[in-house]
Protein backbone atom coordinates (compact mmCIF):
# COMPACT_ATOMS: atom_id res chain seq x y z
CA UNK A 1 0.00 0.00 0.00
CA UNK A 2 2.21 2.74 -1.30
CA UNK A 3 1.91 5.92 0.69
CA UNK A 4 0.46 4.27 3.79
CA UNK A 5 2.74 5.00 6.74
CA UNK A 6 2.88 2.46 9.57
CA UNK A 7 4.55 2.93 12.96
CA UNK A 8 6.08 -0.10 14.66
CA UNK A 9 6.79 0.34 18.36
CA UNK A 10 9.47 -2.00 19.68
CA UNK A 11 12.90 -2.81 18.28
CA UNK A 12 13.12 -6.42 19.42
CA UNK A 13 12.91 -9.30 16.98
CA UNK A 14 9.10 -9.15 16.84
CA UNK A 15 9.13 -5.48 15.92
CA UNK A 16 11.87 -6.00 13.36
CA UNK A 17 10.09 -8.92 11.69
CA UNK A 18 6.77 -7.05 11.72
CA UNK A 19 8.55 -4.25 9.86
CA UNK A 20 10.00 -6.86 7.47
CA UNK A 21 6.53 -8.14 6.56
CA UNK A 22 5.12 -4.63 6.19
CA UNK A 23 7.94 -3.47 3.91
CA UNK A 24 7.42 -6.61 1.80
CA UNK A 25 3.82 -5.47 1.28
CA UNK A 26 4.79 -1.98 0.17
CA UNK A 27 4.09 0.08 3.29
CA UNK A 28 6.32 2.88 4.53
CA UNK A 29 7.49 1.92 8.00
CA UNK A 30 8.92 3.87 10.93
CA UNK A 31 10.23 1.82 13.85
CA UNK A 32 10.55 3.30 17.35
CA UNK A 33 12.71 1.72 20.06
CA UNK A 34 13.13 3.15 23.56
CA UNK A 35 16.64 1.72 23.92
CA UNK A 36 18.81 -0.06 21.36
CA UNK A 37 17.70 -2.38 18.59
CA UNK A 38 17.74 -6.04 19.72
CA UNK A 39 18.91 -4.72 23.07
CA UNK A 40 16.56 -6.37 25.59
CA UNK A 41 14.93 -9.83 25.68
CA UNK A 42 15.84 -10.51 22.04
CA UNK A 43 19.54 -10.69 22.94
CA UNK A 44 19.02 -12.66 26.16
CA UNK A 45 17.53 -15.85 24.76
CA UNK A 46 18.87 -19.41 24.96
CA UNK A 47 20.60 -18.72 21.61
CA UNK A 48 18.61 -21.37 19.75
CA UNK A 49 16.36 -21.47 16.71
CA UNK A 50 14.27 -24.49 17.60
CA UNK A 51 10.90 -26.15 17.51
CA UNK A 52 10.79 -26.69 21.25
CA UNK A 53 11.09 -30.42 21.89
CA UNK A 54 9.43 -30.08 25.30
CA UNK A 55 6.21 -28.74 23.73
CA UNK A 56 5.59 -32.15 22.16
CA UNK A 57 5.00 -33.44 25.67
CA UNK A 58 2.18 -30.88 25.93
CA UNK A 59 0.66 -31.97 22.61
CA UNK A 60 1.49 -28.71 20.80
CA UNK A 61 2.51 -30.45 17.60
CA UNK A 62 1.33 -27.70 15.25
CA UNK A 63 3.34 -25.06 17.11
CA UNK A 64 6.46 -27.23 16.98
CA UNK A 65 6.03 -27.90 13.26
CA UNK A 66 5.66 -24.18 12.51
CA UNK A 67 8.76 -23.35 14.55
CA UNK A 68 10.79 -26.03 12.75
CA UNK A 69 9.77 -24.58 9.39
CA UNK A 70 10.85 -21.14 10.60
CA UNK A 71 14.14 -22.58 11.87
CA UNK A 72 14.78 -23.72 8.30
CA UNK A 73 13.90 -20.25 6.94
CA UNK A 74 16.50 -18.61 9.18
CA UNK A 75 19.16 -21.17 8.19
CA UNK A 76 18.43 -20.60 4.51
CA UNK A 77 19.27 -16.89 4.85
CA UNK A 78 22.94 -17.97 4.87
CA UNK A 79 24.03 -15.32 7.38
CA UNK A 80 26.70 -17.44 9.07
CA UNK A 81 25.07 -16.49 12.38
CA UNK A 82 23.13 -19.75 12.81
CA UNK A 83 24.40 -23.33 12.55
CA UNK A 84 23.16 -26.86 13.34
CA UNK A 85 24.47 -28.62 16.44
CA UNK A 86 23.84 -31.85 18.32
CA UNK A 87 21.99 -31.83 21.64
CA UNK A 88 22.29 -34.72 24.11
CA UNK A 89 19.67 -35.72 26.67
CA UNK A 90 21.47 -37.90 29.26
CA UNK A 91 19.54 -40.91 30.53
CA UNK A 92 19.93 -41.91 34.18
CA UNK A 93 18.69 -44.96 36.00
CA UNK A 94 15.54 -44.08 37.93
CA UNK A 95 15.68 -40.35 37.12
CA UNK A 96 13.89 -38.08 34.68
CA UNK A 97 11.69 -39.13 31.81
CA UNK A 98 12.16 -42.73 30.65
CA UNK A 99 14.41 -43.35 27.66
CA UNK A 100 11.59 -44.71 25.48
CA UNK A 101 9.60 -41.50 25.97
CA UNK A 102 12.55 -39.29 25.07
CA UNK A 103 13.38 -41.44 22.04
CA UNK A 104 9.76 -41.28 20.86
CA UNK A 105 9.82 -37.50 21.24
CA UNK A 106 13.01 -37.09 19.20
CA UNK A 107 11.69 -39.39 16.45
CA UNK A 108 8.55 -37.24 16.21
CA UNK A 109 10.77 -34.14 16.18
CA UNK A 110 12.68 -35.68 13.23
CA UNK A 111 9.40 -36.33 11.43
CA UNK A 112 8.15 -32.78 11.95
CA UNK A 113 11.49 -31.43 10.68
CA UNK A 114 11.43 -33.39 7.40
CA UNK A 115 13.06 -31.36 4.66
CA UNK A 116 15.42 -29.53 7.01
CA UNK A 117 18.45 -31.62 5.88
CA UNK A 118 19.63 -31.87 9.49
CA UNK A 119 20.87 -35.27 10.74
CA UNK A 120 18.45 -37.58 12.52
CA UNK A 121 18.25 -38.22 16.24
CA UNK A 122 20.10 -41.20 17.73
CA UNK A 123 20.63 -43.30 20.86
CA UNK A 124 24.17 -43.35 22.29
CA UNK A 125 26.13 -45.52 24.67
CA UNK A 126 27.39 -44.40 28.05
CA UNK A 127 30.97 -44.06 26.76
CA UNK A 128 29.92 -42.02 23.73
CA UNK A 129 27.88 -39.70 25.94
CA UNK A 130 30.78 -39.09 28.34
CA UNK A 131 33.07 -38.31 25.41
CA UNK A 132 30.56 -35.83 23.97
CA UNK A 133 29.91 -33.99 27.26
CA UNK A 134 33.15 -33.86 29.27
CA UNK A 135 32.67 -34.08 33.04
CA UNK A 136 29.07 -35.29 32.87
CA UNK A 137 27.85 -36.96 36.06
CA UNK A 138 28.66 -40.67 35.67
CA UNK A 139 26.69 -42.22 38.53
CA UNK A 140 23.65 -44.03 37.13
CA UNK A 141 24.32 -42.83 33.56
CA UNK A 142 22.92 -45.23 30.96
CA UNK A 143 23.71 -43.24 27.83
CA UNK A 144 21.89 -40.49 25.98
CA UNK A 145 19.50 -39.65 23.19
CA UNK A 146 20.65 -36.91 20.83
CA UNK A 147 18.80 -34.74 18.35
CA UNK A 148 19.77 -31.81 16.16
CA UNK A 149 18.78 -28.18 16.50
CA UNK A 150 20.20 -24.80 15.50
CA UNK A 151 22.23 -22.43 17.63
CA UNK A 152 22.47 -18.74 16.82
CA UNK A 153 23.93 -15.44 17.89
CA UNK A 154 20.57 -13.82 18.67
CA UNK A 155 21.79 -10.24 18.92
CA UNK A 156 23.85 -10.41 15.73
CA UNK A 157 21.11 -12.19 13.79
CA UNK A 158 18.48 -9.70 14.92
CA UNK A 159 20.73 -6.80 13.93
CA UNK A 160 21.36 -8.45 10.56
CA UNK A 161 17.60 -8.49 9.94
CA UNK A 162 17.28 -4.84 10.97
CA UNK A 163 20.15 -3.83 8.68
CA UNK A 164 18.43 -5.48 5.70
CA UNK A 165 15.35 -3.37 6.39
CA UNK A 166 17.26 -0.11 6.83
CA UNK A 167 18.81 -0.68 3.39
CA UNK A 168 15.28 -1.10 2.03
CA UNK A 169 14.05 2.17 3.52
CA UNK A 170 13.01 1.43 7.10
CA UNK A 171 13.09 4.63 9.18
CA UNK A 172 14.58 3.55 12.50
CA UNK A 173 14.41 5.72 15.63
CA UNK A 174 16.42 4.30 18.54
CA UNK A 175 16.44 5.85 21.99
CA UNK A 176 12.96 7.28 21.47
CA UNK A 177 10.36 5.87 23.88
CA UNK A 178 6.66 6.06 23.03
CA UNK A 179 4.77 7.47 26.01
CA UNK A 180 1.26 6.94 24.71
CA UNK A 181 -0.61 5.75 21.66
CA UNK A 182 -4.18 6.23 20.48
CA UNK A 183 -6.61 4.09 18.52
CA UNK A 184 -6.73 6.71 15.75
CA UNK A 185 -3.05 6.08 14.92
CA UNK A 186 -1.49 8.87 16.97
CA UNK A 187 1.72 8.46 18.99
CA UNK A 188 3.14 10.67 21.68
CA UNK A 189 6.94 10.80 21.75
CA UNK A 190 9.54 13.41 22.61
CA UNK A 191 6.80 15.87 23.52
CA UNK A 192 5.18 15.66 20.10
CA UNK A 193 2.16 13.87 18.66
CA UNK A 194 2.68 12.06 15.36
CA UNK A 195 -0.07 10.55 13.21
CA UNK A 196 0.19 7.29 11.25
CA UNK A 197 -2.19 5.24 9.14
CA UNK A 198 -1.81 2.39 11.64
CA UNK A 199 0.35 1.45 14.63
CA UNK A 200 1.94 -1.86 15.63
CA UNK A 201 2.55 -2.39 19.33
CA UNK A 202 5.37 -4.96 19.38
CA UNK A 203 6.87 -4.05 22.74
CA UNK A 204 7.14 -7.63 24.00
CA UNK A 205 6.67 -7.96 27.77
CA UNK A 206 5.63 -4.30 27.94
CA UNK A 207 2.82 -4.52 25.34
CA UNK A 208 -0.18 -4.57 27.68
CA UNK A 209 1.50 -2.04 29.96
CA UNK A 210 1.69 0.42 27.04
CA UNK A 211 -1.99 -0.20 26.27
CA UNK A 212 -2.96 0.39 29.90
CA UNK A 213 -1.07 3.66 30.18
CA UNK A 214 -2.73 4.73 26.91
CA UNK A 215 -6.21 3.93 28.22
CA UNK A 216 -6.78 1.12 25.70
CA UNK A 217 -8.63 -1.95 26.95
CA UNK A 218 -7.36 -5.44 26.17
CA UNK A 219 -8.96 -8.79 27.12
CA UNK A 220 -5.55 -10.40 27.53
CA UNK A 221 -2.80 -9.97 30.09
CA UNK A 222 0.91 -10.64 29.81
CA UNK A 223 2.74 -12.44 32.57
CA UNK A 224 6.41 -11.49 32.57
CA UNK A 225 8.67 -14.44 33.30
CA UNK A 226 12.34 -13.65 33.79
CA UNK A 227 14.70 -16.15 32.24
CA UNK A 228 18.35 -15.87 33.25
CA UNK A 229 21.44 -17.47 31.74
CA UNK A 230 25.10 -17.72 32.63
CA UNK A 231 27.72 -17.44 29.91
CA UNK A 232 30.68 -19.42 31.24
CA UNK A 233 34.28 -20.17 30.27
CA UNK A 234 33.66 -23.86 29.59
CA UNK A 235 33.98 -24.50 25.86
CA UNK A 236 31.58 -27.17 24.58
CA UNK A 237 31.49 -29.07 21.31
CA UNK A 238 27.94 -30.39 21.69
CA UNK A 239 24.95 -29.34 23.77
CA UNK A 240 23.25 -31.02 26.70
CA UNK A 241 19.76 -30.85 28.17
CA UNK A 242 19.52 -31.37 31.93
CA UNK A 243 16.20 -32.71 33.26
CA UNK A 244 15.12 -31.26 36.59
CA UNK A 245 13.07 -32.91 39.32
CA UNK A 246 10.17 -30.48 38.75
CA UNK A 247 9.93 -31.42 35.06
CA UNK A 248 11.74 -28.34 33.74
CA UNK A 249 14.75 -28.59 31.49
CA UNK A 250 17.94 -26.53 31.56
CA UNK A 251 20.18 -26.13 28.52
CA UNK A 252 23.98 -26.32 28.55
CA UNK A 253 25.02 -25.19 25.08
CA UNK A 254 28.07 -24.23 23.04
CA UNK A 255 28.15 -20.48 22.39
CA UNK A 256 31.06 -18.95 20.50
CA UNK A 257 34.08 -20.40 22.36
CA UNK A 258 32.16 -20.51 25.63
CA UNK A 259 29.03 -22.20 26.99
CA UNK A 260 25.64 -20.89 27.99
CA UNK A 261 23.66 -22.35 30.89
CA UNK A 262 19.98 -21.66 31.46
CA UNK A 263 17.27 -20.82 31.83
CA UNK A 264 15.52 -19.99 35.06
CA UNK A 265 11.83 -19.13 35.41
CA UNK A 266 10.95 -16.35 37.84
CA UNK A 267 7.83 -14.19 37.78
CA UNK A 268 8.78 -10.55 37.32
CA UNK A 269 7.31 -7.07 37.15
CA UNK A 270 8.09 -5.52 33.73
CA UNK A 271 8.33 -2.10 35.40
CA UNK A 272 11.42 -3.22 37.34
CA UNK A 273 14.98 -3.31 35.94
CA UNK A 274 15.62 -6.61 34.15
CA UNK A 275 18.50 -8.41 35.82
CA UNK A 276 19.15 -11.87 37.24
CA UNK A 277 18.77 -12.27 40.97
CA UNK A 278 21.48 -13.79 43.13
CA UNK A 279 19.05 -16.64 43.81
CA UNK A 280 18.88 -17.41 40.08
CA UNK A 281 22.67 -17.37 39.73
CA UNK A 282 22.97 -19.75 42.68
CA UNK A 283 20.26 -21.97 41.18
CA UNK A 284 22.11 -22.31 37.88
CA UNK A 285 25.44 -22.97 39.59
CA UNK A 286 23.78 -25.69 41.69
CA UNK A 287 22.19 -27.29 38.61
CA UNK A 288 25.55 -27.39 36.86
CA UNK A 289 27.20 -28.90 39.95
CA UNK A 290 24.60 -31.70 40.04
CA UNK A 291 25.22 -32.65 36.43
CA UNK A 292 28.83 -31.79 35.58
CA UNK A 293 32.23 -31.98 37.29
CA UNK A 294 34.13 -29.97 38.23
CA UNK A 295 31.56 -27.47 39.50
CA UNK A 296 31.60 -24.01 38.00
CA UNK A 297 33.58 -21.37 39.85
CA UNK A 298 32.38 -17.79 40.10
CA UNK A 299 35.40 -16.56 38.20
CA UNK A 300 34.33 -18.69 35.21
CA UNK A 301 31.16 -16.63 34.75
CA UNK A 302 31.76 -14.31 31.79
CA UNK A 303 28.30 -12.74 31.67
CA UNK A 304 24.93 -13.00 33.41
CA UNK A 305 22.02 -12.39 31.04
CA UNK A 306 18.36 -11.91 31.81
CA UNK A 307 15.31 -11.31 29.66
CA UNK A 308 11.53 -11.26 30.09
CA UNK A 309 9.37 -13.81 28.31
CA UNK A 310 5.78 -12.62 27.76
CA UNK A 311 3.20 -15.32 28.53
CA UNK A 312 -0.33 -14.57 27.29
CA UNK A 313 -3.26 -15.33 29.60
CA UNK A 314 -6.88 -14.11 29.75
CA UNK A 315 -7.44 -11.33 32.27
CA UNK A 316 -8.36 -12.84 35.60
CA UNK A 317 -6.08 -15.86 35.01
CA UNK A 318 -2.86 -14.23 36.19
CA UNK A 319 -2.22 -17.14 38.56
CA UNK A 320 -1.62 -19.55 35.66
CA UNK A 321 1.33 -21.97 35.82
CA UNK A 322 3.91 -20.37 33.53
CA UNK A 323 5.84 -23.63 33.17
CA UNK A 324 3.05 -25.17 31.09
CA UNK A 325 1.64 -21.98 29.56
CA UNK A 326 1.68 -21.66 25.79
CA UNK A 327 4.32 -19.60 24.00
CA UNK A 328 1.99 -19.05 21.04
CA UNK A 329 1.28 -15.48 19.98
CA UNK A 330 -1.88 -13.44 19.52
CA UNK A 331 -2.66 -10.29 17.57
CA UNK A 332 -5.27 -7.91 18.99
CA UNK A 333 -6.70 -5.07 16.89
CA UNK A 334 -8.19 -1.98 18.54
CA UNK A 335 -9.04 0.75 16.05
CA UNK A 336 -5.85 1.45 14.14
CA UNK A 337 -3.62 -0.24 16.73
CA UNK A 338 -2.43 -3.83 16.31
CA UNK A 339 -0.83 -5.36 19.40
CA UNK A 340 1.33 -8.46 19.17
CA UNK A 341 1.21 -10.52 22.35
CA UNK A 342 3.63 -13.32 23.23
CA UNK A 343 5.53 -15.42 20.73
CA UNK A 344 9.01 -16.86 20.32
CA UNK A 345 12.25 -15.71 18.69
CA UNK A 346 12.21 -18.58 16.19
CA UNK A 347 8.72 -17.79 14.91
CA UNK A 348 9.11 -14.00 14.79
CA UNK A 349 8.72 -13.97 10.99
CA UNK A 350 5.33 -15.71 11.19
CA UNK A 351 4.29 -13.36 13.97
CA UNK A 352 5.22 -10.46 11.71
CA UNK A 353 3.09 -11.88 8.90
CA UNK A 354 0.10 -12.08 11.25
CA UNK A 355 0.63 -8.43 12.17
CA UNK A 356 0.83 -7.43 8.50
CA UNK A 357 -2.47 -9.25 7.81
CA UNK A 358 -4.16 -7.10 10.48
CA UNK A 359 -2.61 -3.92 9.06
CA UNK A 360 -3.95 -4.87 5.62
CA UNK A 361 -7.45 -5.06 7.11
CA UNK A 362 -7.09 -1.65 8.75
CA UNK A 363 -5.90 -0.11 5.51
CA UNK A 364 -8.67 -1.70 3.46
CA UNK A 365 -6.47 -4.09 1.56
CA UNK A 366 -8.54 -7.18 2.43
For the regions a protein language model found, what residue spans apply to each?
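Glycine-rich FAD pyrophosphate-binding loop
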Residues: 23-44
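Beta1/beta-strand and adjacent pyrophosphate-binding region of the FAD-binding site
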Residues: 2-14
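Flavin (FAD/FMN) cofactor-binding and adjacent substrate-gating region
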Residues: 91-168, 173, 180, 256, ...
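Conserved beta-strand-loop-beta-strand element in the redox core of flavoprotein oxidoreductases
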Residues: 180-194, 199
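C-terminal catalytic lobe of FAD-dependent flavoproteins
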Residues: 219-228, 234-236, 243-260, 267-366
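Flavin (primarily FAD) binding-site architecture
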Residues: 201-216
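Dinucleotide-binding Rossmann-like beta1-alpha1 core, especially the glycine-rich loop
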Residues: 47-132, 250
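Short hydrophobic core segments
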Residues: 9, 195-204
